[in-house]
Amino acid sequence: MEGGAAAATPTALPYYVAFSQLLGLTLVAMTGAWLGLYRGGIAWESDLQFNAHPLCMVIGLIFLQGNALLVYRVFRNEAKRTTKVLHGLLHIFALVIALVGLVAVFDYHRKKGYADLYSLHSWCGILVFVLYFVQWLVGFSFFLFPGASFSLRSRYRPQHIFFGATIFLLSVGTALLGLKEALLFNLGGKYSAFEPEGVLANVLGLLLACFGGAVLYILTRADWKRPSQAEEQALSMDFKTLTEGDSPGSQ
């Protein structure tokens, strides 16, 4: 850490973070198991191309996005710029993987002659992806691009935090809609007969909800927020003084 002694990590935080990672990794593994055991696996140049869509979305917009949000809780005492870069990189990886998932489903529909963007899941999915891209672009402009002033960053930060959590929540909800849509399409009336695929997918849905809940709980614990470093506190005091009409060095 730069500029002072490291702040103590809250006792329970590492356990909640570890639990969230266990849920997330199990979620990704179970998604792969569902697609491998019941949907034939994944291949780009065949009827299995569609299966790349759910796997990419779970990895990108759920697991990686959730972990990007947790960066400031996990790396509490590292240099702020290092943490920012990691936060931004995880979001880039999530965006790229999600884009692959979008290309997969649109390309599959084109080859099969299926209609696009008619379901609630598809509408929500496009909304989430666009919001996520805009959130990343604006966040990069404000927090990583050197031209943004400290005062501008301070004003935008609450909106960035709110929309980050909201987009993640929308991503989880959209994934649940897509899972239900896939089950109804593939199983039809057999879904109500407790088919093994349906049971596995229901457990997958519960894991989605639990991972989302675990991430949001960690994010909303005020006492688990990253402590301000010395240089951040100095900048904050300077900004406060400037907004009150005095110069930082007037006293």
From Swiss-Prot:
Q: What is its EC number?
A: 7.2.1.-
Q: Which residues form the Cytochrome b561 domain?
A: 19-220
- GO biological process terms held by the UniProt record: ascorbate homeostasis; electron transport chain; intracellular iron ion homeostasis
Cofactor(s) essential for the protein: heme b
Q: Cofactor binding mode, per the note?
A: Binds 2 heme b groups non-covalently.
Query: Which residue stretches are annotated as topological domain Cytoplasmic?
Result: 1-16, 73-85, 146-158, 220-251
Binding sites annotated in the UniProt record for L-ascorbate:
80, 84, 153
Gene Ontology terms, cellular component aspect? chromaffin granule membrane; lysosomal membrane; membrane
Q: Which disease is it linked to?
A: Orthostatic hypotension 2: An autosomal recessive disorder characterized by severe orthostatic hypotension apparent from infancy or early childhood, low plasma and urinary levels of norepinephrine and epinephrine, and episodic hypoglycemia. Some patients may also have renal dysfunction and reduced life expectancy. Orthostatic hypotension, also known as postural hypotension, is a finding defined as a 20-mm Hg decrease in systolic pressure or a 10-mm Hg decrease in diastolic pressure occurring 3 minutes after a person has risen from supine to standing.
Name this polypeptide is given: Transmembrane ascorbate-dependent reductase CYB561
State the organism of origin. Homo sapiens (Human)
